[in-house]
Amino acid sequence: MEALLERMQNRGHGGGFLTSCEAELQELMKQIDIMVAHKKSEWEGRTHALETCLKIREQELKTLRGQLDVTHKEVGMLHQQVEEHEKIKQEMTMEYKQELKKLHEELGILKRSYEKLQKKQMREFRGNTKNHREDRSEIERLTAKIEEFRQKSLDWEKQRLIYQQQVSSLEAQRKALAEQSEIIQAQLANRKQKLESVELSSQSEIQHLSSKLERANDTICANELEIERLTMRVNDLVGTSMTVLQEQQQKEEKLRESEKLLEALQEEKRELRAALQSQENLIHEGRMQKEKLQEKVKAADTQHAVEAIRLREESLAEKKYTSQGQGDLDSVLSQLNFTHTSEELLQAEVTRLEGSLESVSATCKQLSQELMEKYEELKRMEAHNNEYRAEIKKLKEQILQGEQSYSSALEGMKMEISHLTQELHQRDISIASTKGSSSDMEKRLKAEMQKAEEKAVEHKEILDQLESLKLENRHLSEMVMKFELGLHEAKEISLADLQENYIEALNKLVSENQQLQKDLMNTKSQLEISTQMCKKQNDRIFKPTHRRTTEFKNTEFKPTHGQHRHDGIKTEHYKTGLHSPRGQASDSIDPMSRVLSPLSPQISPCSSTRSLTSYSLCKSHSLPSALDTNEANFSDTVSESMNDQEEFMSSCSLPVSPLGSIATRFLEEEELRSHHILERLDAHTEELKRESEKTVRQFTALK
């Protein structure tokens, strides 16, 4: 533009009519400079605003990057927490498995100990049977020792009442102990049921814990899958954000390049506009000059025509002036040609500038469209960033909720596990206590069973000794009858003395038998009263214990049929072992009462001196009939009748003969045996007293 202005100025200087346009051109240039400065300030403001927007966007991108880094760190922390939780859970599962193994081992130990106890009981039962066989052999040895009861009959009568009281108390204690043993057996059965219920409950709890562990593992797997999914989404978001950042950077670079192009195009546009305006002004000035020149040409034509007419009129006179007019016309024509050529040049430049303006306007439109598209893309990116931020917030909330739920679930599991461990510890303590009490009770029952069996064996021994005494008494009665017959033939004894002695002996026997019957009735009544009182006391004592044992837990299972049968067999065996001596005694005493009939012949010869008459024989034969009437009453008092027999045998004075020496030896041996048996009975009663006191103390301590 400046070059054009310089050329125009040079051309104007070449002509005189262009000097008047310089001032206007300078004013136009000033206005153009002002316009350019104004536009420049506007464009600078816009560029500054765009730069501030870009800086804000860069800051936002930096914040987003920082947030993404924070999220990455949080995700890493979450991964570490998840790994720690997994390790803790694995450790907890290992601990639970170890505890479960310990419980299984303890249950196996309990089962083995219980089986060992059962085997020991069976072995002891078999050993007791073997002991019974050994005792039978001992009974055969001790059959001869029962004859010692004859000499010490008076001492036995004195101590009989004491022994009867002791026996009644011991029987009452025995019944109480039997009832206690039954109750203890019931308690043992209940404890077995409780052990089974504890085993079942422990198995159910183990299954419950295993199901809970499986559920926890499933939740952990689900949480891990969610965390992986969230990490994938976060990684995708990070990748998209990185791509967005790269695109934004590329777009920023393109914007900068487009801004630079716009600035260059705007500068070119300004220059073109200034050149166009200067050219339009020049064209307008050229047109004005052309119009002036045309008017001058018209005036010159008119003047030329007038002058031609005048020349024609003055042909020769005016020849000098015609040469000058033609030179002016030539100059005017040359100027007109120059103006035409300059106009053509200006029009070509105007068309060229218009084409360049159109191209610049098209490029400006394209750049503006690109800017609008970039603004829209920036808005979209902002919307996507907002969406990503919202999604990140949601993910954080979900992660926090998952952590809270996981922590609450862990706390609940820990509480449940602590509660279950406490319950298992309490159950272990209760099982240990029940084991100790059951072992103690079993030991007591074994001791009591052994004592009862020993008593039964002793009772059987006594009965066998009584049977042997029966046989010996029969043999002695036969020997005495033979001896009496020999004495009756050899010597003559006064009938009056024999009758008196015989009547006195009979009266003594009858009175003693009546006293013994009364004593037996009194002892029986006392025993019945004591048994009833002991039953009432035992019911009162053992009812609260039975309630406590039954109300030990609500969850108890019924014992099996085999256990009931086994316990019932044991109790029946125990009862039969206790009550069989009585039956055997009653069965063995019945035939002993029959032996009393031949005892009277032993008395009559003892009281007679030398001879017997038919009256004495009739009396001696009438004595068994009198004694047979009292057989039913004397079925339980064989020992007392034997004592009476010993009294009469001691009161009689046998003559010196080989039969008398045999009888004296027999009596001496029986004295020794009776003394030994009395010592054994005293020791046995003392042992029974001690054991009964111990058992009473133990039961009082348990209560």
Swiss-Prot record:
Modified residues (N-acetylmethionine): M1
Taxonomy, superkingdom: Eukaryota
Residues modified as Phosphoserine: S278
Post-translational modification: Polyubiquitinated via 'Lys-48'-linked ubiquitin, leading to its degradation. Deubiquitinated by USP36, promoting its stabilization.
Cellular component GO terms, alphabetical: centriolar satellite; centriole; centrosome; cytoplasm; spindle pole
InterPro entries tied to this protein: Cep63/Deup1_N
Coiled coil: 77-199, 242-303, 346-533
GO biological process: cell division; centriole replication; de novo centriole assembly involved in multi-ciliated epithelial cell differentiation; DNA damage checkpoint signaling; negative regulation of protein K63-linked ubiquitination; protein stabilization; signal transduction in response to DNA damage; spindle assembly
Localisation per UniProt entry: Cytoplasm, Cytoskeleton, Microtubule organizing center, Centrosome; Cytoplasm, Cytoskeleton, Microtubule organizing center, Centrosome, Centriole; Cytoplasm, Cytoskeleton, Microtubule organizing center, Centrosome, Centriolar satellite
UniProt entry keywords in alphabetical sequence: Acetylation, Cell cycle, Cell division, Coiled coil, Cytoplasm, Cytoskeleton, DNA damage, Mitosis, Phosphoprotein, Ubl conjugation
Record's subunit section: Interacts with CEP152 and CDK1; these interactions recruit both ligands to centrosomes. Interacts with CDK2, CDK5RAP2, WDR62, CEP90, KIAA0753/moonraker and CCDC14. CEP63, CDK5RAP2, CEP152, WDR62 are proposed to form a stepwise assembled complex at the centrosome forming a ring near parental centrioles. Interacts with CCDC57; the interaction is required for their location to proximal end of centrioles. Interacts with FXR1; promoting its stabilization.
Family: Belongs to the CEP63 family.
Function: Required for normal spindle assembly. Plays a key role in mother-centriole-dependent centriole duplication; the function seems also to involve CEP152, CDK5RAP2 and WDR62 through a stepwise assembled complex at the centrosome that recruits CDK2 required for centriole duplication. Reported to be required for centrosomal recruitment of CEP152; however, this function has been questioned. Also recruits CDK1 to centrosomes. Plays a role in DNA damage response.
Name by which UniProt lists this protein: Centrosomal protein of 63 kDa
Originating organism: Macaca fascicularis
